[in-house]
């Protein structure tokens, strides 16, 4: 069995298990900054809107060198489901993300991918997340886009 497919399958099982204990959250808007890791070291910025645990995000990665060559500035668009299982302590809550993404031409992955994330919410104000975009072997070019994001989270003003 393909290691990537096995990893994605395990993550989906963990996401489903966490979903049974999930807490619903209010609508939020988030702004984040981060840096790619493993296959590149490029700055990333993102903005997102979450409604009933579904989040739509737009991310922008700077141009620069990657493991597979030079990459132009990259836009990533994603839709994800976020599960916060309620296993946290004193305002520090873990969460998991599973979604799909599209990008404008990465050297590391194909145009359409899965988006996986694991993170920690700090008192519903900040969240720290490790993000992975990958096609799970659908595309030949599947090195993966990995980055760490720090997001400021605020209640939606509407």
Role assignments for model-derived ranges:
Residues 33-39, 51-53, 60-66, 83, ...:
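Transmembrane beta-strands of outer-membrane beta-barrel pores
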Residues 28-30, 53-58, 86-94, 122-130, ...:
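Repeated loop/turn-to-beta-strand initiation elements of outer-membrane beta-barrel proteins
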Residues 49-99:
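Detector for outer-membrane/organellar transmembrane beta-barrel domains
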Residues 1-28, 158:
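Cleavable N-terminal export/targeting peptides
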Residues 27, 39-45, 50-52, 70-77, ...:
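Residues that define the transmembrane beta-barrel architecture of outer-membrane proteins
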Residues 120, 142-158:
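Outer-membrane beta-barrel "beta-signal"
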Residues 24-35, 94-98:
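Transmembrane beta-strand segments of Gram-negative outer membrane beta-barrel proteins
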Residues 93-113:
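Mid-chain, well-packed structural core segment of small domains
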């Amino acid at each position: 069995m393909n290691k990537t497919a096995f990893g994605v399958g395990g993550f989906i099982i963990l996401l489903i298990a966490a979903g049974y204990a999930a807490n619903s959250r209010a609508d939020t808007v988030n702004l984040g900054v981060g840096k790619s890791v493993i296959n590149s070291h490029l700055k990333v910025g993102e903005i997102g809107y979450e409604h009933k645990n579904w989040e739509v995000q737009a991310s922008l990665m700077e141009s620069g060198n990657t493991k597979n060559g030079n990459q132009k500035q990259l836009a990533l668009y994603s839709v994800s489901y976020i599960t916060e299982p309620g296993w946290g302590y004193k305002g520090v809550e873990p969460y998991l993300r599973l979604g799909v993404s599209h990008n404008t031409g990465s050297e590391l992955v194909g145009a359409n991918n899965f988006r996986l994330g694991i993170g920690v919410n700090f008192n519903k104000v900040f969240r720290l997340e490790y993000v992975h975009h990958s096609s799970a072997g659908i595309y030949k070019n599947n090195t993966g886009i990995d980055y760490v994001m720090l997001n400021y989270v605020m209640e939606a003003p509407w």
